[in-house]
Amino acid sequence: MELTRENYNETAKELLTFLQNSPSCFHAVKNVVDMLTAAGFTEVKEEESWKLEAGGRYFVTRNQSSVIAFKVPGKDFKGFQIIASHSDSPTFKIKENPEMEAAHCIKLNVEKYGGMICAPWFDRPLSIAGRLVVSEGSRLVSKLVNVDRDLVMIPNLAIHMNRQVNDGYAYNAQKDMLPVFGSLEAKGTFMSLIAEAAGVKEEDILGHDLFLYNRQPGTIWGADETFLSCGRLDDLQCAFSSVKAVIEGENSSSISVAAIFDNEEVGSGTKQGADSTFLKDVLERINDSLGRTREQYLMAVASSFMISADNAHAVHPNHADVADPTNRPAINEGIVIKYNANQKYTTDAVSAAVFKALCKKVQVPVQTFTNRSDIAGGSTLGNISNAHVSLNTVDIGLPQFAMHSPYETAGVKDTCYFIKAATEFFNSCIVAEGNGNYSLGE
C-alpha cells in the first residue's frame, strides 16, 4: 500500500487520541487492551492454565502496566517474531502523605521518575493519573484514576529572584519542583479529591501509584503540517504502532508477539520490566500449551528475531553539532536503526540487514543513528531483555526532538512508516539458517 498525506494525517490524529487517553502507563496498557479486545484477542492470565488454539489471538498483562499480545498460527511454528517497546515516560510520582503547607499554599511532595528535562515542567497546567488499590469487602481491587482537569502547577521563581535561571540553573527536585495543589483552604483534601475522581470512598483507598502528567493536548503543526507534538511520544508512539501491526499482520509460520514493558525509564529491573522473566515466561507457556518439547522451544528461540522499538534522537536544528557527523537522522525521513559499539544497542550487521531488507521490501525509508564518540548515550530494551531470552535483535526508533520533555516532537509520516514496516515484519517468515544467514519468506 502506498502511503499518502491522508494516511499520514489520519494515523497521526489516531496516535494523538491514544496519547491523550494515556496519561499514565496504566492507562496506556488499558487502551492497548481495548484495541486488542476490539480486534478479537482473548485475555489469558498468568495465574491460570493456558489452553491455546491454532489461529488464536491472545494477550496477557502484568501489573496492569505491561502487556504482551501474541498470535498462534499452529503447533508447528518455527519461531517468535517480537516487537518490544515500553509504556512509561519520565514524570513525577506522588509520594505518600504528599500535602505540604508553604507560603499560604498547599503543595504536593513528589519525586522524579526517570531522566527528565526539568524546565518544561514549569508554568503549565498539570494533573494526576494512575492507579488506586481499593478495599471492597474481603477483596482488594485496582482501579484507574485520572483527574481530568487542570489541577496543579509548578511555578517558576521570578527571574528577579533567580538571575541564574537562564545560565544553566541546576534544579533541586525537592525544593524547586513541587507542584502547587491549592490555597490553604485545600488542606487535607488531596485524597478525597482523588477518591472522588475514581468514584470510590477515601477511607477505602489502601494504596496508590499516582503520577503527574502534562495537560497540554497534542497537536499537528508546522507550515506544511508535518510535525506532531504531545507528551509521552517516547515510547508510546512505538507501542501504538506495534499494536496496530500485530493486529493487522498475518503469519502462518511464526508466533507474532508485541511486548510492551514498564519501567524502561528507570532501568527495567522490575517484575513488569524488560529485565524480568515476563517475556521468557510467556514464550515458554506458549510452547508448553501447544504440547511442544523443551528442545522445540530452544530451537524456536534460536530461529527468532526481535525488534526493540524505542524512539531515537533526530538532528536538532539549533544543535546540529551534537549529532554524529555521518549518522544524522531527520524527522519524517524514516525509521532509525540505532548502533553502539559498546552494545548499549543490540544492533549488529546481521540484525540490521534483516530489518533493512524488510523495509526495502515495502519501500519504507531507513536511517542510522549512533552517538558522537565523545558523548555518552542511553540504552534501551533490547540488550536488557536479551539477558533472559537471547535472540537476534535490532534496536530501532522513530526520530524526535526533545526526548524526555513533557512535550516532545516527532514526525507525522514516521508512525505510518513504522506501522507499515512492522506489519511486514509480522507478515514475513524470518528463519535463521545458522552462521548469520537468514531467509525472509512469506
Where are these regions (language model features)?
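N-terminal hydrophobic/helix-forming segments and targeting peptides
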Residues: 1-442
